[in-house]
Amino acid sequence: MCGRYATVRGAGDLSAFFDAADETDGLLAPDYNVAPTDPVPVVRLTTRPPGAPRAAAGTGGAAPAGPPRRVLSLVRWGLVPHWAKDPRAGARMINARSEGVATSATYRRYFGTHRCLVPAEGWFEWKGRGRPYFMTGGAGGPLVFAGLWAAHPAVPGGLTCTILTTAAVGPLAGVHDRMPLLLPRDRWADWLAGPASPALLAPPPPESVAALEIRPVGPAVGDVRNDGPDLVARVSAPAAGEPPATLF
């Protein structure tokens, strides 16, 4: 699973990188230790015209529909289905297995029409109960996870999301058996706007995984109260039998 990750880029950088209108209202701040129910940036499509009330997005508002456009939104991590009576259920829905979203009673609606891009510097995993690792792409643009979003009136801000996971490959499988479904740039448009099909859920291409670094980090990330760049800094080399620091 992906239960902790880092997102540190500013709204201006992200909106430019994804060619998306910024709707985070200056509230997006770096977070090196994103935990369930935290606010996170996502890129999604809306047909709400610029300047129309945001309550119209995904909630049946009366604003006239316009052409789809990308927006950078701040949403709560942990999807709360529109029919949920208790929004606290979202804390358990931070991940969705990609193998089942097309048929799941919970997720198939959102897979059909509410897909989003989730930018991240990388994600954390623990090898068993031992050392934490930070999986990152290093320099360049952020990693992009496949996500789903939902609107719910009882959630602050109104929007929530989940991150899709897939089977881990290569040395990543030596840390955890699951990984986020990574989307290279040439899959963004189809993920956001293409018809729902199994092809959207294809594993990440080998070159996307080959570029990742498996970085041993310190134990402080285990406490959700901790934050800051030290959490993603490399620590001493892993002990014998642990995964190497890099994939290749």
PLM regions with names:
Residues 1-248:
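Short linear sequence motif anchored by a di-proline
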